[in-house]
Amino acid sequence: MKILQQDDFGYWLLTQGSNLYLVNNELPFGIAKDIDLEGLQAMQIGEWKNYPLWLVAEQESDEREYVSLSNLLSLPEDEFHILSRGVEINHFLKTHKFCGKCGHKTQQTQDELAVQCIHCGYQTYPVICPSIIVAVRRGHEILLANHKRHYSPNGGIYTTLAGFVEVGETFEQAVQREVFEETGISIKNLRYFGSQPWAFPNSQMVGFLADYESGEITLQESEIHDAQWFSYDQPLPELPPTGTIARKLIHVTLELCKAEHKCD
């Protein structure tokens, strides 16, 4: 981090937790003085549109109006990823002010994104928690679940199955375990789909497509309120927001369901 001078220039990432300050739904741009940033701490984390991109240290008291990152999923993908990166780096710096090995204070390294203990020299890098997310298809049907965190009296969001990768697991093993734990369904024909950074606060969602193999839906009641098979040609429940990897998985799977039905 450096102390900003009045003529420091570029795009500015200001965060409060997973919230960001935007101007007309865009990152503020200009010199530090004009955006009332002079004297604050910041670090350059890259470039955006060929200009420096600065992450400003989070302020305890700030009268600016912030917007949740989760409300910005409709932004272009590259812009959403820039915002996510800022949120994740901010979270890392806030939660690693002290050494996890000896408890002394840390300081940022000069040549890479990391913090180092000023006492024992132990170096820590941003923590990324890998999670899997999978869409399961059975013929012309897709398996969707209403997680307890998404439940509402009107039904709530139905989405794909997901969960964190456990220590010692492959991504493929995690997918098979999560699907079976949450719904009692066994799957086959597992294939990679894509990934999405998920800064809530520091996950990396790794997406898969899979086909039904066997089993009847048996809910993991501590996690899942409801799970059902939905046909592509029937009304669907409320789905995750556009821009999420969950919504992309659902869209692709519904297209596969439609193609399967045409071949019958």
Curated annotation (Swiss-Prot):
Q: Where does a divalent metal cation 3 bind?
A: 178, 182, 223
Q: Which CDD domains match?
A: NUDIX_NADH_pyrophosphatase_Nudt13 (cd03429)
The entry's a divalent metal cation 1-binding residues are 162, 182, 223
Q: Which of this chain's residues are annotated to bind Zn(2+)?
A: 99, 102, 117, 120
* Source organism of the structure: Haemophilus influenzae (strain ATCC 51907 / DSM 11121 / KW20 / Rd)
- State the SUPFAM superfamilies in the record: Nudix
User: What cofactor requirement does the entry state?
Assistant: Mg(2+); Mn(2+); Zn(2+)
Summary of subunit composition and partner proteins = Homodimer.
Stored InterPro entries: NAD-cap_RNA_hydrolase_NudC, NudC-like_C, NUDIX_hydrolase-like_dom_sf, NUDIX_hydrolase_CS, NUDIX_hydrolase_dom, RNA_Hydrolase_NudC, Znr_NADH_PPase
The note describing how and how many cofactors are bound reads:
Divalent metal cations. Mg(2+) or Mn(2+).
**GO MF annotation, one:** magnesium ion binding
* Keywords assigned: Hydrolase, Magnesium, Manganese, Metal-binding, NAD, Zinc
Positions of substrate binding: 112, 125, 196-203, 246
- Please give the HAMAP family that the UniProt record associates with this protein: Nudix_NudC (MF_00297)
Question: Can you say what this protein is called?
Answer: NAD-capped RNA hydrolase NudC
Concerning PROSITE patterns, the annotation shows: NUDIX (PS51462), NUDIX_BOX (PS00893)
